[in-house]
């Protein structure tokens, strides 16, 4: 099994693998080009997003700067907006449904590390950099979701996440949730009629 296959399967993998580093550098270059493209040059921005991302739905708007790990593991539905300074660490799939609004400074992480340091690092005597071992899990964001600033999420359809929330577990559909840790505070009553 390749390191990329391990990564997508959620197994411990080596981020320093040559294939993964090549994909990572490619994504960083494409994201840099996107972030530096003139704001009014929507044609070039669309071309770059189509090259960078796994899927670009109709009517996608991403305000730079936008940061990714690989880009190719991010799948957008239709009619989505991502505000400035968002970071998507797509070491596994990030699937975003239709009609999703993502506020500034939202961070979506699919990667995590073992808790014991001996499981995270291969200690060597040579002078090369040793990447820590990593695992992943997909993040799926349902449709009709509005995400406030600064949130890490796994949520259902028709959900609102309050700004500054830290979401560490699934949030059910048709709810309004916020806090650290993020908790459901009430039903999103109107969404049930959509």
Stretch-by-stretch model annotation:
Residues 4-5, 52, 130-131, 137-138, ...:
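Short secondary-structure boundary/capping segments
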């Amino acid at each position: 099994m390749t390191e990329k296959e391990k990564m997508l399967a959620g197994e411990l993998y080596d981020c320093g693998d040559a294939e993964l580093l090549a994909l990572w550098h490619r994504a960083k270059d494409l994201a840099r080009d996107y972030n530096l493209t003139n704001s009014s040059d929507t044609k070039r921005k669309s071309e770059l997003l189509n090259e960078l991302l796994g899927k670009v739905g109709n009517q996608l708007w991403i305000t730079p700067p936008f940061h990714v790990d690989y880009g190719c593991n991010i799948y957008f539905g239709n009619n989505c907006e991502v505000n400035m300074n968002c970071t998507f660490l797509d070491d596994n799939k990030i699937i975003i449904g239709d009609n999703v609004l993502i506020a500034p400074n939202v961070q979506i992480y699919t990667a995590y590390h073992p808790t014991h340091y001996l499981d995270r690092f291969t200690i060597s005597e040579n002078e090369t950099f040793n990447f820590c071992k990593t695992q992943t899990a997909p993040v799926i964001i349902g449709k009709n979701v509005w995400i406030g600033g600064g949130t890490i999420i796994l949520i259902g359809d028709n959900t609102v996440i309050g700004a500054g929330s830290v979401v560490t577990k699934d949030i059910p559909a048709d709810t309004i949730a916020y806090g650290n840790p993020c908790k459901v505070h009430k039903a999103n009553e109107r969404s049930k009629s959509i």
